[in-house]
């Protein structure tokens, strides 16, 4: 087979055609041609740079007098022949009696393969005329009328046309699923019947294709044959390397004018365009619900049919993919086959290990163009960008609350259902997320793998370390629109907002007391149960909350990491420092609705309110005095003790 040339992947327009194109179409042409050339260079096919590419790179018009003269006398350009030929008399004579053209310095690589209907410059009949001229031994050319795509087999053209009609003539009667191509139906049957011919001896996972099986084996042996020349990063699949390279090139050739968003793949801009048009071409006939992606429709169908073929007998949970069942089994077995060579930490998924390794390297290749913040994963950057746009596309049908991530919506839904499938074997605590359970387990093991380089403090969660670092940097990215107050955590801002709204969603069934946060309600409940699971090893004192134990431990160490910049006074808790700062600023955020008096602490406001209600909760046993707050009661006790002595 003759090696691929630049002309085989190029496109040619006549001068008249070029002048008919608008600026966007001309730019698209430039981008496509440059991308084709880069792909050939990457594959090691193109050695010399064509003149056309030089013109395009310099943003010049792809027309010179010399080039225009050549196109004005069009050659017959056909991928079935090794050279270009001049037409003589008519097309038949040209193929029977051909004369090679000489272009001087302009090599064959500099010529472009035309892909318009008049590709071979046949005035009558287009491709059909060319097909008639070809010998019977040569393969014929078939073209799609809608998108002008070329095929060398009539069956391929037919298969392609079915995609435009969206018809799915091949139906699987067993489950009622339909396909537009017969080969897709055959492949689906294999999945359903579980015919997996290739089984992995390492983990027992089975595959129905040898190529997929070969790829999978690389996970266990750690083979990474594809290396990035830019940074030396190794990948076990060629597609992963190609995706990785986009980080460095930052080439986003496909731009949407409506929102200025750019993409490096044409398929991505096609998917994105549907957001603006509001088009939902994938429709469910049973419930008339429509979706903008076929994958979303497939997922939705499962809700109706409950098509879950793979059930785990241990817990009764079922899955619609065998790979999901295999992954789920590991939760029960506790198996963690993927181990980090750096620190020895083990994981139940290879992707989790890959993600963990970045902690050691410190690599953050994904940077936000808006604020310069860098991330370890592209998904984290995508999520971060929503902070700038404020977009929240995922809405809860139950209460109308919107989220910027689908995972956050899934997590939120469990509030309505009350489902908590992940339970701690040590203490019985249940969570609605596996990640929460994993983090919770660190309390029992006391493992703290995440260490602050600034002060040496260690944490059992990476998110806690990130939040802690803001103490040193002073960064407070979350600002209240109501009063302008800023916070270093989004959750604290959410809680703070409830001060303005007065919302207290979490109510104690025992005494009716309501709270802003669920954690405060959980903490409060321990007052009724008397439970104190957190014990100090130093003195044996027990607490009903882990944070109270952490605060107590500072008494033994004497550590006071939070220092006031104004007067130098140090505190063992950040909240104490915040409270102290109000002495300097004069800030009094807690105001009495009854008389307007303001306080710098919420506890002082609570005590003050009792003046209006007449409530006196603190009464000494030895005298008739009574007090509305603990501080006055404590002061009275000290005075009483002094008199006695």
Swiss-Prot record:
Zinc finger (C2H2-type): 142-164, 198-220, 226-248, 254-276, 282-304, 310-332, 338-360, 366-388, 394-416, 422-444, 450-472, 478-500, 506-528, 534-556, 562-584, 590-612
InterPro entries associated with the record: KRAB, KRAB_dom_sf, Zinc_finger, Znf_C2H2_sf, Znf_C2H2_type
PROSITE patterns with a match to the protein in the record: KRAB (PS50805), ZINC_FINGER_C2H2_1 (PS00028), ZINC_FINGER_C2H2_2 (PS50157)
Domain KRAB: 4-75
Protein's GO biological process: regulation of transcription by RNA polymerase II
Positions of region (Disordered): 626-645
Entries under Gene3D superfamilies matching the protein: 6.10.140.140, Classic Zinc Finger (3.30.160.60)
Localisation: Nucleus
Molecular function in Gene Ontology: DNA-binding transcription factor activity, RNA polymerase II-specific; RNA polymerase II cis-regulatory region sequence-specific DNA binding; zinc ion binding
Keywords: DNA-binding, Metal-binding, Nucleus, Repeat, Transcription, Transcription regulation, Zinc, Zinc-finger
GO cellular component: nucleus
Coiled-coil intervals, chain numbering: none
PANTHER family linked: PR DOMAIN ZINC FINGER PROTEIN, ZINC FINGER PROTEIN 833-RELATED
UniProt function note: May be involved in transcriptional regulation.
Family label: Belongs to the krueppel C2H2-type zinc-finger protein family.
Protein name: Zinc finger protein 681
Record organism: Homo sapiens
Name of the coding gene: ZNF681
């Amino acid at each position: 087979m003759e090696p691929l040339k630049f002309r085989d992947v190029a496109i040619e327009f006549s001068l008249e055609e070029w002048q008919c194109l608008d600026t966007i179409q001309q730019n698209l042409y430039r981008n496509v041609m440059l991308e084709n050339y880069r792909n050939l260079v990457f594959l090691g096919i193109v050695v010399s740079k064509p003149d056309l590419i030089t013109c395009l790179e310099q943003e010049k018009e792809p027309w010179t007098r010399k080039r225009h003269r050549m196109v004005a006398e069009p050659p017959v350009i056909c991928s079935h022949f090794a050279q270009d030929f001049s037409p003589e008399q008519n097309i038949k004579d040209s193929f029977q009696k051909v004369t090679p053209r000489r272009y001087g310095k302009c090599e064959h690589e500099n010529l472009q393969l035309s892909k318009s209907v008049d590709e071979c410059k046949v005035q009558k009949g287009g491709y059909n005329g060319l097909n008639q001229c070809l010998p019977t031994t040569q393969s014929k050319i078939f073209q799609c009328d809608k998108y002008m795509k070329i095929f060398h087999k009539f069956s391929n053209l037919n298969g392609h046309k079915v995609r435009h009609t969206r018809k799915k003539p091949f139906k699987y009667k067993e489950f009622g699923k339909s396909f537009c191509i017969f080969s897709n139906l055959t492949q689906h049957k294999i999945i359903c019947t579980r015919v997996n011919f290739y089984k992995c001896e390492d983990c027992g996972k089975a595959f129905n294709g040898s190529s997929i099986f070969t790829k999978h084996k690389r996970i266990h042996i750690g083979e990474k044959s594809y290396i990035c020349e830019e940074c030396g990063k190794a990948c076990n699949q060629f597609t992963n390397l190609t995706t990785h390279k986009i980080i460095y090139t930052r080439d986003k050739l496909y731009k949407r004018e409506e929102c200025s968003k750019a993409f490096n793949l044409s398929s991505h801009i096609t998917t994105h365009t549907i957001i603006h048009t509001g088009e939902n071409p994938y429709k469910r006939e049973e419930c008339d619900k429509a979706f903008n992606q076929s994958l979303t429709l497939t997922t939705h169908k499962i809700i109706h049919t409950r098509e879950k073929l793979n059930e785990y007998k241990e817990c009764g949970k079922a899955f619609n993919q065998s790979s999901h069942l295999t992954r789920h089994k590991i939760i029960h077995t506790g198996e963690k086959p993927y181990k980090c060579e750096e620190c020895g930490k083990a994981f139940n998924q290879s992707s989790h290990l890959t993600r963990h390794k970045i902690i050691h390297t410190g690599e953050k290749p994904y940077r936000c163009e808006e604020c310069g913040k860098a991330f370890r994963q592209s998904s984290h950057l995508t999520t971060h960008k929503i902070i700038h746009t404020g977009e929240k596309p995922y809405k809860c049908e139950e209460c109308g609350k919107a989220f910027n991530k689908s995972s956050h919506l899934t997590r939120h839904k469990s509030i309505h259902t009350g489902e908590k499938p992940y339970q701690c074997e040590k203490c019985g605590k249940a969570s609605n997320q596996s990640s929460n359970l994993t983090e919770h387990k660190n309390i029992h093991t006391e493992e703290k793998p995440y260490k602050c380089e600034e002060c040496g403090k260690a944490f059992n969660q990476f998110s806690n370390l990130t939040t802690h670092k803001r103490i040193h940097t002073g960064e407070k990215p979350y600002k209240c629109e109501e009063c302008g107050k800023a916070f270093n955590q989004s959750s604290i801002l959410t809680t703070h907002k409830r001060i303005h709204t007065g919302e207290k969603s979490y109510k104690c069934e025992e005494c009716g007391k309501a709270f802003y946060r669920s954690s405060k309600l959980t903490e409060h409940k321990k007052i009724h149960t008397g439970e104190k699971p957190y014990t100090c090893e130093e003195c044996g004192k027990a607490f009903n909350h882990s944070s109270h134990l952490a605060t107590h431990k500072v008494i033994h160490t004497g550590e006071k990491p939070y220092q006031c910049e104004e007067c130098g006074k140090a505190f063992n808790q950040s909240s104490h420092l915040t409270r102290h700062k109000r002495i300097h600023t004069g800030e009094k955020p807690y105001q009495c609705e009854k008389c307007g008096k303001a306080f710098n602490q919420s506890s002082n406001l609570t005590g003050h309110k009792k003046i209006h209600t007449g409530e006196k909760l603190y009464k000494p046993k030895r005298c008739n005095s009574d007090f509305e707050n603990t501080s006055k009661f404590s002061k009275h006790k000290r005075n009483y003790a002094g008199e006695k002595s």
